[in-house]
């Protein structure tokens, strides 16, 4: 009799156990739209690149990718929006030289730590910038511009809208022994409008964003900040031809909040690598004159660390003080 009671209890226990709820498996990532926050305005290299890669991710995942431009404070506003977002892989930051390298040495009491607050999921671009002037500008080359600046100290101006566009002219000024006046802008479009209108004298814009202005003849390049001439514009001399060793190139990448699960981080890295392997993206980047360095996940942090050290030296030589 005792054995029957035990058996009956065991059977009832098994039946009861069958109704214990089993935790549902998490939905496959991504199961809804992904937002890429670009911490600068439309038309810049970050915006252009984010849209190209976002389109490829859409095709790969069958989920929408929304590009959200949040300019201001040299990229800090958009960067902070991602720092405080849910670490679930659905809010991604387009990182730049400004947000993850130069701001560390140029912004006092920076509200985020590029290392502790973010996990980099891809570093994928390196390029120089063109020194641009109006087509009708009197200077036909860099030497002519420098001669004019020496003849009228403090009279020639350059526009800038982030650290990447401010550092090259400041750096050049130090090396050439000239004095230029900087004019700050909120976004690249405003600076370009004023350059075309003759309100400022020159502007340094990375090769991606410069492309449209070169193709339509609105602006003319005097030089490029790569160590050598760009394959896309072999007629444009490198600044290094006048000042040996001059090289200022930047990077782009993507990052998520640091608490994002590692499996999602790995998937995002894979999406980025697949996007950059596509023939369409490669073709477009060749048109922009870009030099690509697709970094695997293990090397991302090291690349950003090296860039941070490099830009700390750039800004030191340029004499740009923290603000």
What do these predicted regions represent?
Residues 34-36, 43, 50, 67, ...:
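Residue-level signal for nonpolar/aromatic packing positions in well-ordered secondary structure
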Residues 26-115, 155, 164-165, 178-201, ...:
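N-terminal (or domain-start) structured segment
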Residues 98-109, 166, 170-175, 202-234:
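A ligand-binding cleft/hinge motif common to bilobed small-molecule-binding domains
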């Amino acid at each position: 009799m005792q054995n029957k009671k035990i058996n009956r209890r065991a059977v009832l226990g098994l039946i009861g156990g069958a109704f214990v709820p089993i935790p549902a498996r998490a939905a496959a990532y991504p199961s809804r739209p992904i937002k890429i926050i670009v911490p600068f305005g439309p038309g810049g290299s970050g915006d252009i690149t984010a849209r190209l890669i976002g389109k490829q991710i859409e095709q790969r995942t069958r989920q929408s990718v929304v590009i959200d431009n949040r300019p201001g404070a040299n990229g800090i506003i958009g960067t902070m929006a991602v720092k405080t977002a849910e670490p679930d892989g659905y809010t991604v930051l387009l990182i730049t030289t400004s947000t993850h390298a130069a701001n560390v040495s140029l912004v006092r009491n920076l509200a985020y730590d590029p290392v502790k607050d973010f996990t980099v999921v891809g570093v994928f671009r390196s390029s120089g910038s063109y020194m641009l002037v109006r087509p009708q500008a009197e200077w036909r080359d860099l030497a002519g511009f420098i001669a004019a600046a020496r003849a009228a100290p403090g009279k020639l101006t350059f526009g800038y809208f982030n650290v990447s566009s401010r550092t090259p002219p400041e750096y050049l000024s130090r090396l050439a022994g000239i004095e230029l006046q900087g004019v700050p802008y909120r976004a690249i479009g405003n600076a370009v409008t004023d350059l075309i209108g003759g309100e400022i004298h020159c502007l340094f814009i990375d090769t991606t964003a410069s492309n449209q202005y070169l193709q339509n003849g609105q602006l003319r390049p005097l030089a490029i900040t790569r160590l050598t001439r760009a394959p896309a514009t072999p007629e444009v001399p490198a600044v290094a031809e006048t000042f040996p060793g001059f090289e200022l190139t930047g990077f782009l990448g993507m990052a998520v909040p640091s608490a994002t699960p590692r499996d999602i981080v790995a998937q995002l890295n894979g999406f980025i690598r697949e996007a950059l392997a596509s023939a369409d993206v490669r073709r477009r980047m060749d048109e922009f004159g870009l030099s690509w360095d697709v970094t695997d996940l293990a090397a991302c942090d090291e690349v950003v660390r090296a860039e941070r050290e490099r830009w700390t030296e750039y800004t030191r030589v340029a004499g740009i003080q923290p603000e």
